[in-house]
Amino acid sequence: MALVKTKPTSPGRRSMVKVVNKDLHKGAPHAPLLEKQFQKSGRNNNGHITTRHKGGGHKHHYRVVDFKRNDKDGIAAKVERLEYDPNRSANIALVLFADGERRYIIATKGMVAGQALLNGAEAPIKAGNNLPIRNIPVGTTINNVEILPGKGAQVARAAGGSAVLLAREGLYAQVRLRSGEVRRVHIECRATIGEVGNEEHSLRVIGKAGATRWRGIRPTVRGVVMNPVDHPHGGGEGKTAAGRDPVSPWGTPAKGYRTRSNKRTDSMIVQKRHKR
């Protein structure tokens, strides 16, 4: 994997920086693990915009990724190849199990074709293996962490993502996330050893607006250049300031305002990610 700065043959390529991984599979994805993915463009069934700045972009299939990895315990597996996934920042790996079934998983850092993998409590502590947190040594770097046993990985799934297992106390373990938050997780929740691969993803430079549109992302218009009917910052004769503290189009404070409202799981957060 390497960062490649393109030659300035056009304005769009002048500042472009690409992540090149020669180990990725160049052919078609594994067809049985593909599903149709329809363009929703941020609209609901009424046609109303529910998520702004979405629309257009290249067509692509959804790759069915196994985030649970709990029904192949003890069955030896081998990484067949690494693939690009347009639906996420991390790369995925096509894994062949000894019983003949193939599945996609999130590729961990250092994973290569031909690597042996194992799921389950008896799996060795080696990058890419998946096992319950009760069987993982304290201090281990982990990724694809479950929040609820059997629900599937929900935390540390993006490119370069990871968490650290800090402690185990009774039925719960403490996990430190990249944000600095320390969270309690049941010891029967599963996690994968190591970090998520494609860690250089954050260093890429898109280079031009068109490449962002290929990804289905539409322009973000500043509220201060809108009309008053469209945004609280809008209006005024000529170029004017917002006239108030920054807010969203619906009046919610935009800078530093905490919006977490799930009090039911507050007891699972040992240390908040906020500094104060």
Swiss-Prot record:
<keyword id="KW-0687">Ribonucleoprotein</keyword>
<comment type="subunit">
    <text>Part of the 50S ribosomal subunit. Forms a bridge to the 30S subunit in the 70S ribosome.</text>
</comment>
<feature type="region of interest" description="Disordered">
    <location>
        <begin position="37"/>
        <end position="59"/>
    </location>
</feature>
<feature type="compositionally biased region" description="Basic residues">
    <location>
        <begin position="50"/>
        <end position="59"/>
    </location>
</feature>
<dbReference type="InterPro" id="IPR008991">
    <property type="entry name" value="Translation_prot_SH3-like_sf"/>
</dbReference>
<keyword id="KW-0694">RNA-binding</keyword>
<dbReference type="InterPro" id="IPR022666">
    <property type="entry name" value="Ribosomal_uL2_RNA-bd_dom"/>
</dbReference>
<dbReference type="InterPro" id="IPR022671">
    <property type="entry name" value="Ribosomal_uL2_CS"/>
</dbReference>
<dbReference type="InterPro" id="IPR022669">
    <property type="entry name" value="Ribosomal_uL2_C"/>
</dbReference>
<dbReference type="Pfam" id="PF00181">
    <property type="entry name" value="Ribosomal_L2"/>
</dbReference>
<dbReference type="InterPro" id="IPR014722">
    <property type="entry name" value="Rib_uL2_dom2"/>
</dbReference>
<dbReference type="GO" id="GO:0002181">
    <property type="term" value="P:cytoplasmic translation"/>
</dbReference>
<keyword id="KW-0689">Ribosomal protein</keyword>
<dbReference type="InterPro" id="IPR014726">
    <property type="entry name" value="Ribosomal_uL2_dom3"/>
</dbReference>
<comment type="similarity">
    <text>Belongs to the universal ribosomal protein uL2 family.</text>
</comment>
<feature type="region of interest" description="Disordered">
    <location>
        <begin position="225"/>
        <end position="276"/>
    </location>
</feature>
<feature type="compositionally biased region" description="Polar residues">
    <location>
        <begin position="39"/>
        <end position="49"/>
    </location>
</feature>
<dbReference type="InterPro" id="IPR012340">
    <property type="entry name" value="NA-bd_OB-fold"/>
</dbReference>
<comment type="function">
    <text>One of the primary rRNA binding proteins. Required for association of the 30S and 50S subunits to form the 70S ribosome, for tRNA binding and peptide bond formation. It has been suggested to have peptidyltransferase activity; this is somewhat controversial. Makes several contacts with the 16S rRNA in the 70S ribosome.</text>
</comment>
<keyword id="KW-0699">rRNA-binding</keyword>
<dbReference type="GO" id="GO:0003735">
    <property type="term" value="F:structural constituent of ribosome"/>
</dbReference>
<dbReference type="GO" id="GO:0019843">
    <property type="term" value="F:rRNA binding"/>
</dbReference>
<dbReference type="InterPro" id="IPR005880">
    <property type="entry name" value="Ribosomal_uL2_bac/org-type"/>
</dbReference>
<dbReference type="GO" id="GO:0015934">
    <property type="term" value="C:large ribosomal subunit"/>
</dbReference>
<dbReference type="Pfam" id="PF03947">
    <property type="entry name" value="Ribosomal_L2_C"/>
</dbReference>
<dbReference type="InterPro" id="IPR002171">
    <property type="entry name" value="Ribosomal_uL2"/>
</dbReference>
<protein>
    <recommendedName>
        <fullName>Large ribosomal subunit protein uL2</fullName>
    </recommendedName>
</protein>
<dbReference type="GO" id="GO:0016740">
    <property type="term" value="F:transferase activity"/>
</dbReference>
